UniProtKB/Swiss-Prot annotation:
Gene that specifies this protein: hflD
SUPFAM superfamilies referenced in this protein's UniProt entry, alphabetically: YcfC-like (SSF101322)
Naturally occurring in which organism (per UniProt): Shewanella baltica (strain OS155 / ATCC BAA-1091)
Protein name as catalogued: High frequency lysogenization protein HflD homolog
Entry similarity comment: Belongs to the HflD family.
Taxonomic lineage from the root: Bacteria, Pseudomonadati, Pseudomonadota, Gammaproteobacteria, Alteromonadales
Keyword Membrane among record annotations: yes
Length: 205
């Protein structure tokens, strides 16, 4: 397999994995802690030797690959909400990269979280609150806010709001990586088959 395409597809699976977790959390108000940790940990790997270093939990990433098959493949069951969130994340990623200080501020704030992890687990409420504030302070104001749909009772809970923002930050991290690996929105239209085929092969590895 083309290594660049494999890495790019891995990063794209990372975006979809985090977005699907946002959707699940907004609807049900709960998320498996290991799955949450898998996405949040990707934010903290800022200087990876290779793409696989970013996505340590390969089991959770399989959900991202399956979402690629569903969203870009021939399925008639495409999730319009997932697509809407994806479009929103990719639009904000463009604005982040084009902003003068966005990426630098992001790196600085992520370093602070890394120091916090000497004392807390990544799924600790204090760490999640910190990650959520990074999203609110640096990314959310760059463009139109992503409107999250779900159960109003769940969405009113501050901890759910914070987890959703932290997961959107994780989706943004994967979007930045996807773009760094040569990912372009037109690939999602004109290179769909290659992406789907790569996701299928990655699922069987």
């Amino acid at each position: 397999m083309n290594e660049q395409l494999v890495n790019r597809t891995m990063a794209f699976a990372g975006i979809l994995q985090a977005i699907a977790q946002v959707q699940h959390l907004a609807r049900h108000g709960e998320l498996d802690n290991a799955e949450l940790a898998a996405s949040l940990n990707t934010i903290l790997v800022t200087n990876p030797d290779n793409t696989a270093d970013v996505y340590q939990d390969k089991i959770v990433l399989q959900k991202g690959y399956k979402l690629i098959l569903n969203q870009l493949g021939d399925s008639s069951q495409k999730d319009v909400e997932i697509t809407r969130y994806l479009v929103g994340v990719l639009a904000l990623e463009r604005k982040l990269v084009r902003s003068n200080s966005g990426l630098g501020m992001l790196a600085e704030r992520i370093n602070q979280v890394n120091r916090q992890l000497h004392h807390f687990a990544i799924t600790d409420e204090q760490v999640i609150a910190n990650l959520a504030s990074i999203y609110s302070d640096i990314i959310s104001n760059l463009g139109p806010k992503i409107q999250i749909s779900g159960n109003p009772v769940c969405l009113q809970r501050p901890i759910i709001q914070q987890k959703i923002r932290a997961l959107l930050l994780a989706a943004m991290r994967s979007a930045v990586l996807w773009r760094q690996l040569g990912g372009k929105r037109r690939h999602l239209v004109f290179a769909r088959k290659a992406i789907v085929d790569t996701a299928k092969k990655s699922l069987t590895l």
